[in-house]
A protein has these predicted regions:
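Extreme N-terminus nucleophile/cap motif
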Residues: 8-59
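Structured interaction and signal-relay segments at domain junctions
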Residues: 50-77
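Single conserved hydrophobic/aromatic residue that forms the stacking wall/gate
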Residues: 1-9, 188
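Conserved catalytic micro-motifs used in adenylation/nucleotidyl-transfer and phosphoryl/amide-
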Residues: 12, 95-118, 158-187
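Glycine-rich oxoanion-binding loops at beta->alpha junctions
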Residues: 83-94
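Short histidine
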Residues: 37, 117-175
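Acidic, glycine-enriched active-site microenvironments
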Residues: 58, 86, 125, 140-141, ...
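Short acidic-glycine loop/turn motifs at beta-strand connectors
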Residues: 19-21, 46-51, 103-104, 128, ...
Length: 189
């Protein structure tokens, strides 16, 4: 998982921090450095202060996200990215992260590494309550839990979702106002 925040001149790549001028291009570079973590596909979600942009592709970062493509298609000073190595879900374009959703509190991009041990239970419960799933990835369960939360603020929706999931995981989320990082149940904004 790679996240870049240019609004405050920071780029977060797992535990590293550096200056950034183009969030999406720097995210692509970070994904390239982490290519060994997943080679099935890659994706980036960016935000320009008004609109979210998303690009997802099968294959390696260097084959899909050259600087020109990134700059043309992924505008904005905020970005998150993900290299896919599937542990759950089929190897389809739909399952490549980050995922993006509009909620009643605004848009959110979500990238996740790990395994949710209760994802089947949660997914079945969400479907019984009327949720429609687009992917076979357990990450979408997290997105659905965030969207379903009755809380009004995005961070509160995230907290609600985190308290429902079990397993080993790390998440990075991009909202209209912040980047949110979560490891197990520790939340960092």
């Amino acid at each position: 998982i790679v996240a870049c925040l240019v609004g405050s001149e920071m780029c977060i790549r797992d535990s590293g921090i550096s200056n950034a001028k183009d969030a999406s291009a720097l995210t692509a570079l970070g994904l390239h450095a982490l290519q060994h973590r997943g080679q099935e596909g890659c994706g980036i979600v960016s935000f320009d202060g008004e609109k979210y942009y998303s690009e997802k592709r099968f294959g390696l970062v260097g084959d899909n996200f050259n600087k020109e493509k990134v700059l043309n298609n992924l505008k904005g000073d905020y970005a998150i990215g993900h290299n896919r190595y599937s542990t759950t879900g089929n190897n389809t374009l739909r399952n490549i992260q980050p995922f993006f959703a509009d909620t009643n509190a605004g848009g959110i991009g979500v990238a996740h590494n790990g395994n949710l041990t209760n994802s089947i239970y949660l997914r079945n419960k969400l479907v019984e309550d009327g949720a429609i799933f687009y992917t076979t990835s357990d990450t979408e369960t997290i997105v659905q839990l965030i969207a379903k939360s009755k809380r009004s603020k995005t961070i509160d929706k995230v907290v609600d979702a985190i308290f429902q999931i079990q397993g080993g995981y790390a998440l990075v989320m991009l909202t209209q106002t912040s980047l949110i990082g979560v490891r197990l149940s520790l939340i960092h904004i």
